[in-house]
């Protein structure tokens, strides 16, 4: 993101002068705040090459389609600025950035970050197109889709491998995902979308008070990306485990997990008592020892399960945050990859 830093020298460009000297309504018809205008112009300049829009990046492709629909295909910097300004308000809200004029310096860079994270998040929603039996995707979106697939391959516990061996390979086979594959892919999109929303919020409250994206609707206050780690790890996501058979299976699996932990060197923590003198080996003391042994194994199994589930959740969220950052960079990759190298 350093190459997009907004400083006073980088903003003194002919395009910026065009926007700031004349009323915005006379140039693009926008009512955006001055701070947002500056961000729009900076992004537009990043997308230009030889006086024309470079549509080799995901954001460039999206703008090219929008400009073509408005009869502005092949337009110059003014048309690109107008199209980008329109796109931002369509995706992020009519009043996005309305209160940003009170900020300067770091606040402007925060607004840039909010714009890019917001656009990346909105583009996730359009990656898959519903079809009979599943969804399809466009070759134009492969730069972003590959990042999502890599995230899924990096977290096989959350996203088991498809028949093709990997999610990256799945995208190479054809442009169709069946119902199960679509569900897994949408789950990944939700997790990464949440991270993009978090990063957008962390950038500051400038756009949030002016009609930004707000809280992602995919997650409620009582929901969790990972679900119930104990239930999910042993009986499968969405299974309450309330029936007697399921409870027995759960206990058995926890005891087995505890035994594996002990054999791996974990120990039970509490030694099993030896029978007292005068107590029959087949009497009450043996039953007590067995209860203690099973209880210890059950506890070790529970500890191991919760530890693994918690670690998995942390790893998934950390991985998602990294992919979210890569997706933001990918938006302009076609035009600035050499500069970022």
UniProtKB/Swiss-Prot annotation:
Species assigned in the record = Pseudomonas syringae pv. syringae
Consequence of changing residue 25 to T: In strain: NV
InterPro entries xref list: HrpN/Z, T3SS_HrpZ
- The segments carrying the sequence repeats are 210-216, 265-271, 276-279, 311-314
Q: Tell what triggers its expression.
A: Regulated by HrpRS and HrpL.
Localization per record: Secreted; Host cell membrane
Name the gene behind this protein.
hrpZ
Main site of residence?
Answer: secreted
Cellular compartments per GO CC: extracellular region; host cell plasma membrane; membrane
Explain the purpose of this protein: Harpins are proteins able to elicit hypersensitive response (HR) in non-host plants and are required for pathogenicity in host plants. HrpZ forms ion-conducting pores permeable for cations. Such pore-forming activity may allow nutrient release and/or delivery of virulence factors during bacterial colonization of host plants.
The UniProt entry's sequence similarity note says: Belongs to the harpin HrpZ family.
Record GO biological process = monoatomic ion transmembrane transport; symbiont-mediated perturbation of host programmed cell death
Effect listed in the UniProt record for changing residue 205 to G: In strain: NV
The region called 2 X 4 AA repeats of Q-T-G-T is annotated at 276-314
Q: Region labeled Disordered — which residues?
A: 199-228
Q: What is this protein called?
A: Harpin HrpZ
């Amino acid at each position: 993101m350093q190459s997009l830093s907004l400083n006073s020298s980088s903003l003194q460009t002919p395009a910026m002068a065009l926007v700031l000297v004349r009323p915005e309504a006379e140039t693009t018809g926008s009512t955006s705040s001055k701070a947002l205008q500056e961000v729009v112009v900076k992004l537009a300049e990043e997308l230009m090459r030889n006086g024309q829009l470079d549509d080799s990046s995901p954001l460039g492709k999206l703008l090219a389609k929008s400009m073509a629909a408005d009869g502005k295909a092949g337009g110059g910097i003014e048309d690109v600025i107008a199209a980008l300004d329109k796109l931002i308000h369509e995706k992020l809200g009519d009043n996005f950035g309305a209160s940003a004029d009170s900020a300067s310096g770091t606040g402007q860079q925060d607004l840039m970050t909010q714009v890019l994270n917001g656009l990346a998040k909105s583009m996730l929603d359009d990656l898959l197109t519903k079809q009979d039996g599943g969804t399809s995707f466009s070759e134009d979106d492969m730069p972003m889709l590959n990042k999502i697939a890599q995230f899924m391959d990096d977290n096989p516990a959350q996203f088991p491998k498809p028949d093709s061996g990997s999610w990256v390979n799945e995208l190479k086979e054809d442009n169709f995902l069946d119902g199960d594959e679509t569900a897994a892919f949408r789950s990944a999109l939700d997790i990464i979308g949440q991270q993009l929303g978090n990063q957008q919020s962390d950038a500051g409250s400038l756009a949030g008070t002016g009609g930004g994206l707000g809280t992602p609707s995919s997650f409620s206050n009582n929901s969790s990306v990972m679900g119930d780690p104990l239930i999910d790890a042993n009986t499968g996501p969405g299974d309450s485990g309330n029936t007697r058979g399921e409870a027995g299976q759960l206990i058995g699996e926890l005891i087995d997990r505890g035994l594996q932990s002990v054999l791996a060197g974990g120990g039970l923590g509490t030694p099993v008592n030896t029978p007292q003198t005068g107590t029959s080996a087949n009497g009450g003391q043996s039953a007590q020892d067995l209860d203690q042994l099973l209880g210890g194994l059950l506890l070790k199994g529970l500890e191991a399960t919760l530890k693994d589930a918690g670690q998995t959740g942390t790893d998934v969220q950390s991985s998602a945050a990294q992919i979210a950052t890569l997706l933001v960079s990918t938006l302009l990759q076609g035009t600035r990859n050499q500069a970022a190298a």
